[in-house]
């Protein structure tokens, strides 16, 4: 078992408190690996042998590599950059009872109780005046700043019997005392801008501290945002490491999966379709040739899966549940919440066999509907053969999640094989 890839993942997550930081860190990694950044506002020059990427909204990325000789379609993978969190409202300061709290709302379906009684801070992006223009700046308040305090057991004797949390009351973070100047001066200082120059912002709470490896043999990863930065980073590492094949390799990291993907930068947008069409046009393909390429293309939708829980095995289908450190998970759902079918499963299994990577399967217990993910959503706009996969983890949508060290290495190996193979 190699621990180095997992430690690199933890370092990436620590430096990526929001989807905007995720995208910037991916951008820097692509540039360092010789990829050329394209802009949707400009004409593209794409040539065989070239390596390129394009970002949308500062929170989604599509990277692609064109082989010298194209004799196939697109070999694509998709993961997502966002995670459940609390987003600050436009007027965030709330003053009451000699305290200043921050007014927030939930982003995505989180386990709210896991955000209590731990050091938090604020990160995201601000839009500021600069020389007559509006400029975007990333910001992260790099210190322990906030806490969401629990109510003491002495005041709520039934707390351990189950608690219903109200997002407008129970989960408001504490910033300071009655003389606090509020959050804006702190954000402005962290961004190195004047308060009056901030015209807009997208700010979120995030958990402080770096994740860790634990377990008897350090076989588990404990960290925020494993859903879905574990798959996002694993797909990207495989994409960068793969040898050239006859397919155009495409790695997508979309935003807004946790809220349904129906945004201009989500998997339900035209971002991927637009990018593939522009690639084809730059390579001299017409619409019919593009459709022929799509007909022989493939998409791996990578989003983490629920591992069998050590305390609550009753929530899983006993014959179709995955375990941590036992392989990449292929996900199935009869109602198409996952896009896997017999053919796409077979293709991905063959890829994993060639890479020496074990696979597992997951279907939800038949009376528990479970969630959906990128594959079926993306398929409506880019209809290609698709497999939904993930890595097994515990406590999905908790502020800290647990996954297997070995599985992350398995994913990198599988995606390296996938991007380098002729499907």
Language-model region placement:
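N-terminal hydrophobic/helix-forming segments and targeting peptides
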Residues: 1-423
């Amino acid at each position: 078992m190699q621990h180095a890839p997992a430690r690199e993942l933890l370092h990436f997550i620590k430096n990526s408190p929001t989807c905007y930081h995720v995208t910037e860190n991916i951008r820097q990694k692509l540039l360092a690996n010789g990829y050329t950044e394209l802009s949707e506002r400009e004409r593209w020059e794409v040539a065989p042998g070239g390596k390129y990427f394009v970002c949308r909204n500062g929170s989604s990325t599509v990277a692609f590599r064109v082989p010298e000789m194209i004799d196939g379609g697109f070999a694509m993978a998709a993961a997502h950059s966002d995670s459940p969190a609390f987003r600050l409202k436009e007027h965030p300061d709330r003053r009451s009872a000699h305290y200043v709290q921050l007014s927030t709302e939930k982003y995505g379906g989180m386990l709210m109780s896991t955000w209590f009684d731990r050091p938090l801070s604020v990160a995201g992006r601000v839009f500021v005046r600069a020389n007559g223009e509006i400029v975007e700046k990333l910001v992260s308040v790099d210190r322990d700043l906030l806490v969401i305090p629990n109510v003491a057991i002495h005041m709520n004797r039934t707390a351990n019997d189950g608690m219903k949390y109200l997002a407008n009351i129970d989960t408001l973070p504490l910033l300071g005392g009655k003389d606090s100047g509020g959050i804006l001066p702190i954000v402005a200082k962290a961004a190195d801008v004047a308060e009056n120059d901030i015209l807009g912002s997208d700010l979120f709470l995030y958990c402080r501290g770096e994740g860790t490896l634990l377990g008897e043999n350090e076989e588990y990863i404990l960290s925020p945002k494993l859903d879905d930065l574990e798959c996002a980073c694993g797909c990207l590492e495989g994409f960068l490491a793969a040898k050239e094949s006859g397919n155009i390799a495409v790695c997508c990291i979309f935003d807004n999966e946790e809220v349904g993907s129906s945004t201009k930068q989500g998997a339900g947008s035209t971002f991927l379709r637009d990018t593939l069409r522009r690639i084809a046009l730059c390579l001299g393909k017409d619409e019919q040739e593009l459709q022929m390429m799509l007909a022989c293309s493939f998409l791996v939708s990578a989003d983490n899966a629920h591992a069998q829980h050590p305390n609550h095995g009753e929530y899983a289908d006993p014959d179709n549940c995955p375990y941590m450190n036992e392989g990449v998970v292929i996900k199935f759902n009869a109602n198409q919440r996952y896009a896997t079918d017999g053919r796409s499963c077979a293709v991905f299994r063959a890829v994993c066999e060639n890479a020496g990577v074990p696979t597992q399967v997951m279907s939800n217990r038949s009376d528990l509907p479970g969630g959906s993910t990128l594959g079926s959503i993306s398929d409506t706009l880019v209809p290609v053969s698709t497999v939904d996969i993930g890595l097994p983890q515990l406590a999905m949508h908790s502020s800290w999640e647990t996954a297997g060290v070995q599985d992350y290495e398995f994913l990198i190996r599988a995606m390296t094989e996938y991007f380098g193979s002729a499907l």
